[in-house]
Amino acid sequence: MYQHIPTAHSVRKFNFLLLAFVLFASIFPAILPASVSASSICSAVWDRKTIYTSGQQASYKGHEWTAKWWTQGEEPGTSDVWQDLGVCSTNPTNPPDPSNTPPTVPTNLAVTAKTSTSVSLTWAASTDDKQVIGYTVYYNDNLQAVTKTNATITNLTPNTTYTFTVKAKDNQGLESEASQPLKVTTDTDTLPPEPATPCRPAGLYDSGVKNIPYCQAYDQDGREKLANDSKRRIIGYFTSWRTGKNGQSKYLVTDIPWKSLTHINYAFAHVDSNNRVSVGSPTDPTNPALGLTWPEYPDALMDPSLPYKGHFNLLTQWKKKNPGVKTLISVGGWAESGGYIDENGKRIASGGFYTMTTNADGSVNQAAIDTFATSAVDFLRKYNFEGIDIDYEYPTTMNQAGNPLDWQFSTPRLKGLMTGYNALLKTLRVKLDQASAEDGKYYMLTIASPSSAYLLRGMESFQALKYLDYVNVMSYDLHGAWNEFVGPNAALFDDGKDGELIKYNIYNTPQYGGIGYLNTDWAYHYMRGMMQAGRINIGVPYYTRGFQNVVGGTDGLWGKAVGKNCPTGLTACGDGATGIDNIWHDKDENGKEEGAGSNPMWHAKNLEKGIAGSYLKDHGIVNPVLTGTYKRNYDSTLVAPWLWNAEKRVFLSTEDEQSIGAKADYVIKNGIGGIMIWELAGDYDWYKDRNDGKGEYHMGSTLTKLMHSKFLAATPYDASNSKTPLPADKLALKIEVTGFQLGDQNYPINPTLKITNNSNLTITGGSVIEFDVPTSTSAQFSSYGGDSVKLISAGHTGPNVGGLKGNFHRVAVTIPTWKSVAPGQSIDVSIVYYVPISGPTNYTITIDGKKYAVTDK
C-alpha cells in the first residue's frame, strides 16, 4: 500500500496554515462552528411562518442554525441561507453530546377518531440511544408537541384534508426524521347544527311547537320590536283600582302616556277558586275591568260594539290607536298571590298560586296548572291581550317570606314551591306557543321577580327564567317598614354602609366578598346568569317608602326606626310613616292604616316644595297642614334621592328626574332591555292652575317621557348571552343544578351539579366542564364532596360600591381521573358558593384535549 511521507516543505506549509487559521479564528470567532463549545443551548425552534434576518438564530433537529440573510419558510439544512452552528441542548445542565444520534422514525401512524374539527392519532414509539422525551405532530404548516404516542389535534376546519407527520425528540434536543405522511379529512359537524328558528331570542326555551310566529314580535337578531321608536322597553303597570269612584284622583286608560311606552301591564287578574285566570264577574257593573263606565269624561266613553265595559273596553280602543304598544294581563300581586278580592271587597283566602301549583305534600299540582294555563290562553284571546305576566309573591323556600295572610298555604308547601313554579312557567310557555302557532299571533310570557338576595336564596338557581320572553325585576322595596333599617327604596348601587347588611355582618364576612346585595345593580347581575342583558328589565318605583321617628343616620339615611304596632304575623318591624306622609297606604284586616310612608311621587314633590295639595282631604287627611320642612337629599353613589323632615324625623325615599335619568343611562350603558314602572299613576307633572291657582304637582308623565327621550337615542339592547365564542362542536349533556337545602338551611349554598351524558362519546377521567356564573356571588367556589371545583377567572372581586365590574366568573369542574361517564350514565358534583346566582350558563366540556360546547338536544 502506498503511504505518503511528508517532506520538510509540506510540514512547514501545514504549520503556516495552522497558525494562520488560529489567528483568523481569534479575530473572527463567530464564523467557527458552535460545536467547538460544548455548552451551546438551543434557541427557539425554527418556525416556518417566522421571518428571520441576517444573524438571527433558531434551533432545528437538535442543531443551532443562524440565518445568513432574510428568509421565511426555508427549512434549515435544505438551503444555503442557513449555517449549521452544531449540536445544541435544550437543557443547560445537560450539554450536547456530539456522539448522540437522533431517535428512530415513528412508525404505524394511524387515526383513532375524528370529528368535524379534530383528529385523534396514534403511532408506535421511537427508540433512542439516550431517552425519547416527546413527539411533534406536523400538519399543514402547524405543529403540536406531545409527550405520549397519541395526540388529539383540535380547532381544525370541517370537511378539510390535512397531512400529518410525526417526529420524535430526545433529551439532547435531537429530532428524528418524519414519519410516513398520513392524510385525513375531517368530518362535517359533530352534531348537525340546530335548525335556525327565525327571530327567536337566544336562550328562550324551545317548546318544540312548530310555526311559532316569533317574527311578529322579534327581528332577525332576536330583539323585540318596540313601539314609539324606543330602543329599550318602557313597561308601565296600570292598576285597576284608581277609578275615581271613591272620590280620590282617577287614573284611567286615557291618562296613560301611550306615545312614551312600549308595554302596558294591567294589574291585576287573580287565580280564582277553580284555578282559572279571572278579573271577577263579567256581569257586575262595579267591576273595574269589565263593568264600570265613566260617562262624565268625554274621552273615556265606552265602545258599545264590544261585549264588555270597564278598563278593558278602553284598553281595546286605545290599543287600536297605538297598535305597536303591547298589552299584557298581570296575575297575582302582593294582595292576590294567595287569594283574591271578591266583588264585595272581601279577601278570599283561596290559596291562589300556592295551591294551584303545589299540593299539600309538596308535589306538583299539574292538573290545576293545566287548567290555569288553558284559561290563560282563553283569557288572552277573549280580551285581546298579547301576553301574560305572572306576579307570584313569592315561590321561595324562605319561610314566611310573602304576604302573612298567605303563610297558611306557603309554609306546609315550602319544599315543593319552586318545582311547582317551574312547572307552571314551562306549561304556560308550551300552551302559549301552541296558541301562537294556531292564531298566527305571538303571545308573550313574563314575570315580575323579586330582587332581594334573601328571597332569591330560596329560589334555587331560577331555572324557570329560560321560559320567559323577559323578566321584570322588582328592584324596589329593598328597604321599608317591615324592619327597622332606614334606607332607599330602590338604590341603583351599594355604598358599603347599608344598615341592614352591617347589622348581619355581611360586609365583613369573608365568604360574601364584601358584596352588598340590596340594590338594582346586584339584582341585574343575578339575572345575567340565565338571561342576556336584553331580556332583563330593571324596575323603578313611582311611589315612596318611608319611616317616622327615625334615630341616627345622615339626614335619616342608614338610621333606625323601630316599630311598636307590627302587622299581623310580624314580631318586629319598622315604624312606617303615616298620615300626610302615607296617602297611598294599605289597610289591615281591621281597616286600620298601615304605616309605610307610601305616596305617589307627585305628592312627594309637593311635600318637597312645601305645598299642601288640594287632594289631601280626598285621602282622609282631615287637617292638611304641613309640619316642618321636607329637605331633598341625593346620594350619587347610591343614585338615590330622599326627603328628610328633621322636625318630624320623617324619611321618605323618592325618585325624580336626576335618579331616573341616571338609571336610564345605566340601562343604555349595560345593554339592558329596559325599565319597568310600578306604577304609572305615581308619575308627575306641574299644573299651575290647580290648588286654587297656586299650582301643584299631580298625576303626569314627566319621568316616563324622560326615559323615552333617552331610549330614542340609545343603541339597540344586547341580544347575546356570551361575549366569548363557544366551540363549534357540540356534545349532548343534560346538566341539572339540584339538591338545594330549604330556606335558611341553604347557606352556604351547596347544590349538586348532576351531569348526564346523552352523547355517544364516553366522558373520560380528567375531563373538564367549564361554565359561567354571575358576579352576584363572590369569586369563591369549592366542594363539600371533595370534587375538583376551581375558579378559572373572576369577573369581580372585592366590595361592589358603585357597581359590579364584570358579568361572569368562569368556573371549572374536573371529573376524577379514575372515573369515566359512559353514554347514558350520570355523575354528581358538589358545588359550594355563598351568594345567590341564576344559571350557570355557557357550558363547555373538554375530553382528551378536545373542547365541545354543551347542548341539551
Indicate where each model-derived feature is located:
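Terminal connector regions
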Residues: 816-857
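Substrate-binding surface in catalytic domains of secreted glycosidases
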Residues: 276-302, 395-597
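Pro/Thr/Ser/Gly-rich low-complexity, intrinsically disordered linker/stalk tracts
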Residues: 98-127, 158, 176-189
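Tryptophan-rich substrate-binding surfaces of secreted polymer-degrading and adhesive proteins
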Residues: 35-100, 183, 187-188
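Solvent-exposed loop/turn segments flanking beta-strands in beta-repeat/beta-sandwich domains
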Residues: 126-139
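Glycan-recognition patch characteristic of GH18 chitinases/ENGases
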Residues: 192-380, 572, 578-608, 614-615, ...
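Extracellular low-complexity, Gly/Ser/Thr-rich intrinsically disordered linkers
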Residues: 64, 242-243, 602-716, 737
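Beta-strand-rich modules
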Residues: 153-172
